[in-house]
Amino acid sequence: MSILKETKRFMVVAMFIACVFISNNMNVAVANEIGYPGMGRGDRQPGCDHGNCPPDQPANPYHRGCEKSKRCRGPDPPALPRKMI
């Protein structure tokens, strides 16, 4: 029975150490947050002042894709034979 008690005691100590280690790492993760200065001024062109900028245009215009059920991406499937053996 003493081996079982020692094993339980060891597991409790190991869990406590793991919890302390994880909680210390959580504080470091919270500190690595990107703020507004890190993001810069956005996608504006250099030298673009107020009122002198061309209008924004999307890089890739949206086009709705084709669904597989509509079969518009490839040839039609082969026709089924009329007689099934």
From Swiss-Prot:
One of its GO terms (cellular component) is apoplast. It comes from the Eukaryota. Disulfide bonds join 48-53, 66-72. GO terms for biological process: calcium-mediated signaling; cell-cell signaling; regulation of growth. Residues 1-31 form the signal peptide. Keywords: Disulfide bond, Hormone, Secreted, Signal. The keyword Secreted applies. Its main location: secreted. Residues 60-85 are annotated as: Disordered. It is found in: Secreted. Residues 75-85 have a biased composition (Pro residues). The keyword Signal applies. Pfam families: RALF. GO terms for molecular function: hormone activity. InterPro entries: RALF. Belongs to the plant rapid alkalinization factor (RALF) family. Cell signaling peptide that may regulate plant stress, growth, and development. Mediates a rapid alkalinization of extracellular space by mediating a transient increase in the cytoplasmic Ca(2+) concentration leading to a calcium-dependent signaling events through a cell surface receptor and a concomitant activation of some intracellular mitogen-activated protein kinases. This is Protein RALF-like 28. The lineage of its organism: Eukaryota, Viridiplantae, Streptophyta, Embryophyta, Tracheophyta.
